[in-house]
Swiss-Prot record:
Family the entry assigns: Belongs to the SHMT family.
Keyword check for Transit peptide: no
Cofactor(s) listed: pyridoxal 5'-phosphate
Name of protein: Serine hydroxymethyltransferase
Lineage: Bacteria, Pseudomonadati, Pseudomonadota, Betaproteobacteria, Burkholderiales
Keyword Lipid biosynthesis appears in the UniProt entry: no
Gene Ontology MF, one: pyridoxal phosphate binding
Species annotation: Janthinobacterium sp. (strain Marseille) (Minibacterium massiliensis)
Sections of the chain in a coiled coil: none
Chemical reaction(s) catalysed: (6R)-5,10-methylene-5,6,7,8-tetrahydrofolate + glycine + H2O = (6S)-5,6,7,8-tetrahydrofolate + L-serine
SUPFAM superfamilies, per the entry: PLP-dependent transferases
Length: 414
C-alpha cells in the first residue's frame, strides 16, 4: 500500500532537487524559445492524476481492456472540445507528439517510395516534412519547396514542382516561418493534381484557435499539431481530419503506431482545449502577436535584420551576420544573461547547422507571464545590448539584473 505522504521530495531527493532548480530557472529566465510555453496548473494537475495508471487501448466505447468507462469520458471530452475549437469533422487526440501525428498521416495514406512535398528544413520547414535523416526522408521520395527573394513562400515554384512531380501528399506548415501561409492556394494545387493535403500547424495552433492566424481546417484533408507551443497545453499531439478519413487515421494511430494512449496526458489536453475555448485565450493570443511585432521592431531599430523583414505571427528569425556573431554564440551569451532562445539557421545559411547565422525568437511564453508591448520592446533592447557587447561581462551582469526585475514583476505562477 502506498502512503499519501509518500511525496517526491521524500522518495527521491536528487530528482526533486533537479526539478526545483528547473522551476527556479523557468521563473528567473525570460523564455523566448518559440516552441515553448508555460502550461496552466490545471493542466499539470490533470497530468498528475491516477489516470496515469490506466491502460486504454482502442477508442471510447471500443476498448480492449475493461474498466475504461471513466477514461472514455475523459477522451471524449478532449475530442469534442478539439473539434469545436477548430471546426473539424473528426479528431484523434492520442498521438504522443507532433512527429507521431505526422507519422500517423503518412502511415494512413502513403507507402514507402511514394512522393511527398514539404517545405525545405533549410528554409523554415520541419524535419518530419522530408529531412534526409528523418524517417520521412528515408521512406519517401521528397520534393522540397522554399522561399523566394522576399523570403516568403514561393507559391509559384511550389505549384510548378507539384505539377511536375505529382506528389501523393503535399505538406504545408513550418517550424521557423514568421508569415501567414496561404492554405487555400496549397489546397487548390493539391486538388488539381489529385494529392492529399496535410497541414502541420504545430507552431500556429494557439493563434489559429483564437482567429489570429488562418485556419487550415476548411482546406486540408489532415491537420496535425502539437498541444504545447502556442496552444499552451501538455506535451503531445493530435490530428484533425475530414470525416471520410477518420477510420484510416484512427487505425494508423492504433494499432498502427501506438499501443495504449497516455490517458493522463489526454486529460491535460482536454483541460487545455477548454482553456482555449475561453474568451481570455483570444485576448492572450492577440497579445502574443502584438508582443512579437514589438520585439521584432525593437530589434530592427537596433540594427538587426529580421528574416522576411517582419513577423505576422508569434515567431521570428534574427539574422546575426551584421553583428558578426553566430547563432551558437548568441544563444550562449543570451543564456548567460538569463534570456533563453535557440540558434537557428537562416535561409541559405553559410554556417553549419550546429553553429548557424541566426536565432529564433518567440513571444508565447513571455506573454503568458503577462508581458505586453513595453516589456517586449525592453527585451528586444536587452538582446541587442548583449549582442553588441559580446565580450563585456559588465553588460551581461547589467542585463541579467534587468531580466530579474522583469521576472520578479511578472512571475510565471502568481
Amino acid at each position: 500500500m502506498f502512503s499519501k505522504d509518500q511525496t517526491l521530495a521524500k522518495t527521491d531527493a536528487e530528482l526533486w532537487s533537479a526539478i526545483q532548480k528547473e522551476n527556479t530557472r523557468q521563473q528567473e529566465h525570460i523564455e523566448l524559445i518559440a516552441s515553448e510555453n508555460y502550461t496552466s496548473p490545471a493542466v499539470m494537475e490533470a497530468q498528475g492524476t491516477q489516470l496515469t495508471n490506466k491502460y486504454a487501448e482502442g477508442y471510447p466505447g471500443k476498448r480492449y481492456y475493461g474498466g475504461c468507462e471513466y477514461v472514455d469520458i475523459v477522451e471524449q471530452l478532449a475530442i469534442d472540445r478539439l473539434k469545436q475549437l477548430y471546426g473539424a469533422d473528426a479528431a484523434n487526440v492520442q498521438p504522443n507528439s507532433g512527429s507521431q501525428a505526422n507519422q500517423g498521416v503518412f502511415l494512413a495514406v502513403l507507402k514507402p517510395g511514394d512522393t511527398i512535398m514539404g517545405m525545405s528544413l533549410a528554409e523554415g520547414g520541419h524535419l518530419t516534412h522530408g529531412m534526409a535523416l528523418n524517417m520521412s526522408g528515408k521512406w519517401f521520395n521528397v520534393v522540397s519547396y522554399g522561399l523566394n527573394d522576399k523570403e516568403e513562400i514561393d507559391y509559384d515554384a511550389m505549384e510548378r514542382l507539384a505539377r511536375e512531380h505529382k506528389p501523393k501528399l503535399i505538406i504545408a506548415g513550418a517550424s521557423a516561418y514568421a508569415l501567414r501561409i496561404d492554405f487555400e492556394r496549397f489546397a487548390k494545387i493539391a486538388k488539381e493534381i489529385g494529392a492529399y493535403f496535410m497541414v502541420d500547424m504545430a507552431h500556429y495552433a494557439g493563434l489559429i484557435a483564437a482567429g489570429e492566424y488562418p485556419n487550415p481546417v476548411p482546406f486540408a484533408d489532415f491537420v496535425t499539431s502539437t498541444t504545447h507551443k502556442s496552444l499552451r497545453g501538455p506535451r503531445g499531439g493530435f490530428i484533425l481530419m475530414k470525416a471520410e478519413h477518420e477510420k484510416i487515421i484512427n487505425s494508423a494511430i492504433f494499432p498502427g503506431l501506438q499501443g495504449g494512449p497516455l490517458m493522463h496526458v489526454i486529460a491535460g489536453k482536454a483541460v487545455a482545449f477548454k482553456e482555449a475555448l475561453a474568451p481570455e485565450f483570444k485576448t492572450y493570443q492577440q497579445q502574443v502577436v502584438k508582443n512579437a511585432d514589438a520585439l521584432a521592431k525593437a530589434l530592427i531599430a537596433r540594427g538587426l535584420r529580421i528574416v522576411s523583414n517582419r513577423t505576422e505571427s508569434h515567431v521570428m528569425l534574427v539574422d546575426l551576420r551584421a553583428k558578426k556573431i553566430t547563432g551558437k554564440d548568441a544563444e550562449n551569451l543570451l543564456g548567460s544573461a538569463h534570456i533563453t532562445c535557440n540558434k537557428n539557421a537562416i535561409p541559405n545559411d553559410p554556417e553549419k547547422p550546429f553553429v548557424t547565422s541566426g536565432i529564433r525568437l518567440g513571444s508565447p511564453a513571455m506573454t503568458t507571464r503577462g508581458f505586453k508591448e513595453a516589456e517586449a520592446t525592453k527585451v528586444g533592447n536587452l538582446i541587442a545590448d548583449v549582442l553588441e557587447n559580446p565580450n563585456d561581462a559588465a553588460t551581461i551582469e547589467r542585463v541579467k539584473a534587468e531580466v530579474k526585475k522583469l521576472t520578479d514583476a511578472f512571475p510565471v505562477y502568481g
